[in-house]
Structures are given as C-alpha cells and as structure tokens.
Amino acid sequence: AEAARIGFPVALKIVSPQASHKTEVGGVTLGLADEAAVIAAAEAMAARLAALEPDAVVEGFLVQEMVSGVEMILGVREDPQFGPFMVAGLGGVTVEAMRDIAFRMLPLTAGEAQGMLDELRGKALLGAFRGRPPRDIAALIAAMVGLSDLFLDHRAHLADLEVNPLIVGSVGEGVRAVDVRPVFKPAGN
C-alpha cells in the first residue's frame, strides 16, 4: 500500500539490526514496478538474510521513492587523538572500491567543504557530464556543513554518523539522504 502511495517505481530496503550494510546481505532492491514485485522482493530479502544470519530479526521493510543523481558518502566521527572529522567522497556501493574520499577536521566551513569536493578524482561527475546537467553543489555543501554542525551539537551521544548514499540532484533539486546510519556512544560515556 505504501509503495502505491509513493508511486512506482520504488526502492525496497530491509530493516534489521543485523543488516547495517544492506547491500552486503541483498537487502536493497531498486526499480520495483508494482505491488507484486515489492512483495516478491521482500520475501527474497528475508530469505537471503535468514540464510546468511539465521538469528537475524527482520523488523520490517522500508519503501522509498526512487531518486536519481550522483551518489555521495558523508561521514563524521571522532578520532581519539585528533578530534572530530568528516569524510566525503563518491558513495553508494562504489565507495569501498574507488576510495575517492577527502577528509577535514570539524567544524567544517563552506569553503572547506568545497575544498573537499575539489580533491575528489571523480569531481567531474558533479558538473555537467555526458549531457546531464550539473549537480546541486550548493545543496551538497550545505548538507556537509549541516552534518558537521549536527555532529558537533550531539557528539556527547554520537560516536559515528554516516550518510550513504546521499543523492545529489541537478541544480535546484537539492540532496536526498537515502540511508543514514548513526552509531550512538554507550550510555554513561
């Protein structure tokens, strides 16, 4: 019912504490065209997770609108020696293969965020590329600075906060956080 309300095609993601990296357990299916496809995908995801992690708990499934753009990763955490920092780079499932990332200490300014983007080997993907319009860099920079501020405001409770992927739309379309993974510090720390 939720998929029909959002409008097809949709993305489906499994919700389980044992599936923090959903793609690694087959917990993401994109471009589902109708309700029957959503149901079949959910059943297949649950079966795959059960085969990989027999004690896994499936809390449900998340249905999301399909969005297009350039996939980025933004992450913030605290290093015990150097303090809080941000990592930004090309995201989605390619982040570990490409390792196209930049680092900065927090707090992050808009100029520092732009500098991080300028360091990326794949920065051309954020501009006009192969007939596609340029991406919304202003919105991406605002998201980077906002994530820096959010982490610093809540660092007493947050150990790590990762947005992957953050979809960067065309100019004027903004950015969309498709998956966010917070890691909270143990109580009493």
Q: Which residue ranges define each predicted feature?
A:
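ATP-dependent carboxylate/acyl-activation modules
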Residues: 1-189
